[in-house]
């Protein structure tokens, strides 16, 4: 099903595209993301909360859409976390102007045993809304696909399911790398 239709920006607008969803705004772009959020809620069953954003190729707006839907959920009062799982070409730090790129999920994926404290140490506030947290990709690893295939990804997601209403995953293009196929195993719904 089509959950929303987000306009394609020209190249100059793409480079400055960021967070466009804001509290108490009723413009067209806010309404598009509210509509996407509502349609995603209809697609999810009661215990489902993990939404993966991907595309066929780079530059199609995965990060932009994932981030703005995450903000939209947070503005609804839902505890939301946005995970940077495009660990080859991370972009969330730039979008949210978070400079600490040493924190992130790759620090967890390399571990055998992960505690809640380990996970919480990698989470950062979004700076946009108190209901929205972010876990960046972290240091870029030499073996992204192998790292994402580990059981540690499921452990992280399962732990986050206990703490958050929605978990939004910003991933690599499914048409270019196999990383996203591995992530799909822990996902409840995929938006392309």
PLM regions: where:
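Beta-strand-loop-alpha "switch" segments that mediate conformational coupling across diverse proteins
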Residues: 1-17, 138
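P-loop NTP-binding module
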Residues: 19, 25-192
């Amino acid at each position: 099903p089509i959950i929303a239709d987000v306009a394609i920006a020209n190249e100059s607008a793409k480079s400055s595209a960021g967070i466009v969803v804001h509290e108490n705004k009723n413009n067209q772009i806010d309404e598009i993301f509210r509509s996407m959020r509502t349609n995603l809620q209809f697609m999810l069953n009661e215990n489902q909360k993990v939404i993966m954003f991907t595309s066929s190729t780079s530059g199609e707006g995965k990060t932009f859409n994932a981030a703005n839907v995450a903000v939209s959920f947070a503005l609804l009062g839902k505890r939301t976390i946005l995970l940077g799982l495009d660990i080859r070409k991370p972009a969330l730090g730039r979008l949210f102007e978070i400079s600490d790129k040493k924190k992130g999920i790759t620090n967890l994926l390399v571990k055998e045993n992960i505690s809640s404290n380990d996970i919480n140490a990698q989470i950062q506030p979004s700076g946009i809304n108190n209901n929205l947290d972010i876990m960046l990709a972290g240091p870029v690893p030499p073996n992204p696909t192998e790292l994402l295939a580990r059981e540690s990804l499921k452990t992280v997601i399962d732990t986050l399911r206990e703490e958050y209403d929605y978990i939004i995953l910003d991933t690599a293009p499914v048409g270019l790398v196999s990383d996203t196929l591995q992530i799909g195993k822990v996902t409840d719904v995929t938006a392309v």
